């Protein structure tokens, strides 16, 4: 969803579960498998990226932002949050799907930057990251000579 190498690497690592969750660390070492944010056990990848109660306001803000921007409901889903893939039953254009996928990748990046923090990332930090990375995406579209596509998305 992005030509930025660091974002592509993040997506690769998420897809292949390279980031060690507390549940995975528990299998390798004699450590606790409790989530650093909410102390729930086990802290699997799904928990760390989506189902942790401390992340609920973060993801609610994410989905509310897109519901308002696209003027159609974007339902919360672990598939969308963790992999950027919308459910098959949803009716979004390719451009809308790509925008949601890119934004969810930026959200995952923000979660990873605060992977071990007690406090969850703020929706404002995600929006700030998204705006700065959109600048890079605009440059990419400009170089390719299709700035119109950037603005349509």
What are these regions (language model features)?
Residues 1-153:
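Family-specific functional microsites
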């Amino acid at each position: 969803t992005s030509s930025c190498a660091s974002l592509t690497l993040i997506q690769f690592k998420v897809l292949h579960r390279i980031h060690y969750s507390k549940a995975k660390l528990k299998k390798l070492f004699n450590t606790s498998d409790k989530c650093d944010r909410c102390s729930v056990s086990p802290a699997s990848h799904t928990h760390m990226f989506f189902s942790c109660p401390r992340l609920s306001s973060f993801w609610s803000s994410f989905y509310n932002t897109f519901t308002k921007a696209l003027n159609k409901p974007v339902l919360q889903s672990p598939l969308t949050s963790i992999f950027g893939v919308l459910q098959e039953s949803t009716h979004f254009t390719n451009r809308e799907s790509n925008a949601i996928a890119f934004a969810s990748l930026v959200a995952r990046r923000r979660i990873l930057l605060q992977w071990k923090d007690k406090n969850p990332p703020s929706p404002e930090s995600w929006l700030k990251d998204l705006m700065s990375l959109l600048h890079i995406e605009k440059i990419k579209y400009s170089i390719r000579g299709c700035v119109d596509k950037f603005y349509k998305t």
